[in-house]
């Protein structure tokens, strides 16, 4: 019985709870059993007692005949980037290894207000800087999927703990963060759904900052409907966050009608299918999904994003610049684990050089250089001006189409032991970064299997505040694909 509970989506589990087919405690206990035996290194802090206490609260509500939220009693994982009151929050960095916040992030509080159950904090790349979830002071995360020869695969990043936990059935859904693709890319590599809303939809209060003009909370789930339910609870104006949007949040779930007749879906002519060993499989998947969308009544429209080729380099200039500023606070005095030195300068130097990982230090240096005297105009200022051109390209495209369809990642699997140049690691975000720069909502959905039986994915990008549109198109694609997790050998 317990194993069967792990196969349910949020919507299915919610309906079962209302029919009293099982209790919230039984649902949480099923995930706790699975979590205790996990070997993915997905969780860095486990909060089983808190989850059970929250589940018992939902049981009491049901016994009293109260109406419950779709998230009530649902076992949720939280990326270790979001502050959780009384529960260690580290951003998977040595510099914050002992930090226990006294307050709750708005995003997680919104979930607990809906009576969701916190299973624990999830592993990630340090300060959300990475695409493999290998830059963590707690060690790398494993993808539940295995490679063609049984080798371990990366789960993507930086929300790799979140994607691995959902795909590995250690929680029913998880919160992640998406700065340049950190929800969508790991969702793609783990064969699940990953969505980020319009920039400003979700409050950043209590979310440890990486790049403030790009950071946005997102969700990782097994179905598009579940993503809509999660974001419905998470989104909303927050007066504690100056970048929070006051735009009303509609009922995302009601937008999923599975009717796309007459919808115009844009295909970007600058995005060619990458030249690699998976090209044939990806080409077949791409063609099959385009035909399916046309059969469902959608119109495929050719569009151009002229400046998209600059998106990746300008993203790394802007994000690294903002990171160098945001991470200046971790000096051992204001924040962070202190390393003693003979002088205050020694203390600063030792604290930051010994407590930050190599990738974080690399990006701080890139950012500090881009912001330095003599380089600011050539790098940071120019990047911001080109960013405006990227946004304008999307504005022009959306005059012709309702949404845009792309691949999510240039590769469908990467071995944990595979040696990649840094440029190749950064290239894994090539399809996801443009939407982040423009602050647009986007969702990654499973779209098929490679010849090796590994997941492939597509990304749908929408207009500002039009999450309902991308949820509906994504749901149509996911209906064709079905649940890829049933192909995982241990399920």
From Swiss-Prot:
Its EC number is 6.3.5.7. InterPro entries: Amidase, Amidase_CS, Amidase_dom, AS_sf, GatA. GO terms for biological process: translation. Keywords: ATP-binding, Ligase, Nucleotide-binding, Protein biosynthesis. One of its GO terms (molecular function) is glutaminyl-tRNA synthase (glutamine-hydrolyzing) activity. GO terms for cellular component: glutamyl-tRNA(Gln) amidotransferase complex. The keyword Ribosomal protein does not apply. The active site is at residues 79, 158, 182. It catalyses: L-glutamyl-tRNA(Gln) + L-glutamine + ATP + H2O = L-glutaminyl-tRNA(Gln) + L-glutamate + ADP + phosphate + H(+). Belongs to the amidase family. GatA subfamily. Allows the formation of correctly charged Gln-tRNA(Gln) through the transamidation of misacylated Glu-tRNA(Gln) in organisms which lack glutaminyl-tRNA synthetase. The reaction takes place in the presence of glutamine and ATP through an activated gamma-phospho-Glu-tRNA(Gln). Heterotrimer of A, B and C subunits. This is Glutamyl-tRNA(Gln) amidotransferase subunit A. It comes from Anaplasma phagocytophilum (strain HZ).
């Amino acid at each position: 019985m317990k194993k069967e509970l792990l196969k349910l989506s949020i919507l299915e589990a919610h309906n079962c709870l209302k029919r009293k087919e099982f209790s919230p405690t039984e649902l949480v206990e099923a995930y706790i059993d699975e979590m205790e035996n996990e070997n993915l290194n997905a969780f860095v802090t486990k909060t089983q007692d808190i989850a059970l206490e929250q589940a018992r609260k939902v049981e009491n509500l049901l016994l009293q005949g109260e109406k419950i939220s779709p998230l009530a009693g649902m076992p949720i994982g939280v990326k270790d980037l979001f502050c959780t009151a009384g529960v260690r929050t580290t951003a998977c960095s040595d510099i914050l290894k002992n930090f226990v916040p006294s307050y709750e992030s708005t995003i997680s509080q919104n979930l607990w207000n809906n009576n969701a159950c916190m299973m624990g904090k999830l592993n990630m790349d340090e300060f959300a800087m990475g695409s493999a979830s290998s830059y963590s002071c707690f060690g790398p995360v494993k993808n539940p999927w295995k490679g063609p020869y049984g080798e371990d695969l990366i789960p993507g990043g930086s929300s790799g703990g979140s994607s691995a936990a959902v795909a590995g059935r250690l929680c029913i859904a998880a919160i992640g963060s998406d700065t340049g693709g950190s929800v969508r890319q790991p969702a793609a590599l783990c064969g699940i759904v990953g969505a980020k809303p319009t920039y400003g939809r979700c409050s950043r209060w209590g979310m440890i900052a990486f790049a403030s003009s790009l950071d946005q909370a997102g969700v990782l789930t097994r179905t598009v409907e579940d993503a809509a339910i999660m974001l419905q609870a998470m989104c909303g104006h927050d007066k504690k966050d100056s970048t929070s949007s006051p735009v009303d949040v509609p009922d995302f779930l009601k937008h999923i009608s599975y009717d796309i007749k007459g919808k115009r879906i844009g295909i970007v002519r600058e995005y060619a299918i990458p030249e690699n060993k998976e090209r044939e499989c990806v080409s077949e998947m791409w063609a099959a999904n385009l035909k399916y969308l046309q059969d469902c009544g959608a119109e495929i429209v050719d569009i151009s994003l002229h400046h998209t080729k600059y998106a990746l380099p300008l993203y790394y200039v802007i994000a690294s610049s903002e990171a160098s500023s945001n991470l200046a606070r971790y000096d051992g005095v204001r924040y962070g684990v202190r390393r003693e030195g003979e002088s205050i300068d020694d203390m600063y130097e030792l604290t930051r050089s010994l407590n930050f990982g190599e990738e974080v230090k690399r990006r701080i240096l890139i950012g500090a250089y881009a912001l330095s005297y003599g380089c600011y105009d050539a790098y940071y200022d120019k990047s911001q001006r080109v960013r405006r051109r990227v946004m304008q390209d999307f504005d022009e495209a959306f005059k012709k189409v309702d949404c845009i369809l792309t691949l999510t990642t240039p590769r469908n699997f990467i071995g944990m032991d595979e040696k990649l140049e840094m440029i190749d690691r950064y290239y894994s975000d090539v399809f996801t970064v443009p939407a982040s720069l423009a602050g647009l909502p986007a969702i990654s959905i499973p779209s098929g299997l490679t010849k090796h039986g590994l997941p492939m994915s597509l990304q749908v990008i929408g207009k500002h505040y039009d999450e309902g549109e991308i949820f509906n198109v994504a749901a149509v694609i996911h209906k064709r694909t079905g649940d890829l997790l049933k192909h995982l050998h241990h399920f």
